[in-house]
Regions:
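Long, charged low-complexity segments
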Residues: 1-25, 32, 36-136
């Protein structure tokens, strides 16, 4: 599995490729690319929750709980939770995994917004990792 940083790097590259489609007015290809990107962004938010917030204490598909990093979880604050929820929810709005409700089939965000959403995850994960590393 890729690290959070590697995943974010790939997402940034995908966003730059999608931006070219946007600039070429290839609306259908851009919409497809952005939907795919937000699906991976959503998965990266999930992985960051597991790896950073829960400090690998609890991991999917592992049959034990590793309590040695449990204290690090205390660095999580309400603002961190809000940023996570906002970023994750936005991803859910743009992925094909969910059938859009009638009247709610949003246009994909413009490239600058896509990059801002990736940056939100990047900033959140780096800030939280730093806070958690400060827990002794």
């Amino acid at each position: 599995a890729s690290s959070i940083r590697d995943r974010i790097d790939k997402l940034e590259k995908e966003a730059r490729a999608a931006k070219r489609l946007f600039e070429e007015n290839d609306d259908e290809a851009y919409k497809t690319a952005v939907s795919s990107l937000y699906s991976r962004l959503r998965a990266t938010w999930e992985r960051a929750l597991e790896d950073i917030v829960f400090a690998n204490v609890v991991m999917r598909h592992r049959d034990y709980i590793d309590t040695k990093n449990l204290k690090r979880v205390t660095a999580l604050e309400e603002a961190d939770v809000q940023i996570f929820q906002n970023g994750f929810k936005k991803c859910c709005d743009f992925v094909d995994a969910h059938d859009p409700s009638r009247g709610h089939d949003p246009e994909p965000p413009e490239p600058s917004e896509v990059m801002a959403d990736i940056k939100s995850l990047k900033d959140w994960s780096e800030k939280l990792r730093s806070k958690m590393n400060g827990v002794s």
